[in-house]
Amino acid sequence: MRNCIESILPGGEEVEIIIVDDGSKKDNTLEIAKEYEEKYPGICKAVHQENGGHGETVNTGLRNASGLYFKVVDSDDWLDSKVLLEVLERIRNLTLSGESIDMLVANFIYDKVGQENKKVMSYANAFPEDKVFGWAEMKNFHLGQYILMHSVIYRTKMLKDCGLQLPKHTFYVDNLFVYEPLPHVKKIYYLNQNLYHYYIGREDQSVNETVMISRLDQQYRVNRLMIECCDVLKVQPKKLRKYMILYLEIITTVSSVLAIKSGTEENLQRKKELWAELREKHFPLWWRMRSGFLGQGVNLPGKIGNKLTILAYKLTQKFYGFN
């Protein structure tokens, strides 16, 4: 956590570091938070909350945020301090010129344990660089390329105005945090530099596949909230609608594959119920997702179909290097 905080401190008084102690673990988070608050008054703010999980931690951070823009940084991760200064300069210049953007996107690095060659998630193929633009100017994303929490900075007021409220005691809310505000984003800025270091590979990490399967109920909870947060088929403009449907397909595919990989009747029933609910409540969306390549791939019949789904998933894992 110290490494995380220290990486943001070079931003000086232009940053507000809200350190939230969730109370979920008996560690020294609050002690460290208060230490930095005393050492850097006006920059660091220590906030304690009763255990509410990751989602409530983000909610608490947003409630306490007074800055123009809001970014979530996990305590295991860190920012490139030089790139942070560049981000602050861009935001400062845009603000002084009267240009208020809703979302700033920067690249992030997958810092995987034991891996020398780090994968960079860049958006140079999809977004124009160093200018304010809208969704109409967005190009197609590559397979495996998405806007994630690690890459996004949102305008604070926009997040509060759109009523973003993440569920308590739930992992995997990062997807909802990024997804739900997208229809409210009108002005975007892309900085083609590697700002965020995403530390992955620990055995106990929430994105570890075994851990995800053990928390599959929470993955499905987030999946449902993403489906219900807006009528995605009515989202404008068309390019944003296309992206949001694709991302929803990806999340639903992950939920489905993990249920299949678990091999338990309980989780296979979860998968069946999710697709049935989607069909009952949002038939046009269900039809679009179910008839697509991914929807067909995770709904192949029988044990042979499940084995083929898992094989395809493993090949995708190997190719893209996730988990």
Predicted regions and their residues:
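Nucleotide-sugar donor-binding/catalytic module of glycosyltransferases
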Residues: 1-218
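Inter-domain helical "communication" segments and dimerization helices
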Residues: 115-119, 123-125, 160, 217-221, ...
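Catalytic-loop motifs flanking and including active-site residues across diverse enzymes
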Residues: 177, 222, 248
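Membrane-interface aromatic/basic loop that binds lipid-linked glycans or pyrophosphate carriers
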Residues: 261-323
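Catalytic core of nucleotide-sugar-dependent glycosyltransferases
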Residues: 193-202, 208-237, 254, 258-283
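All-alpha amphipathic helical-bundle segments outside canonical DNA-binding/catalytic cores
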Residues: 237-246
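P-loop NTPase catalytic cores that bind/hydrolyze ATP
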Residues: 245-257
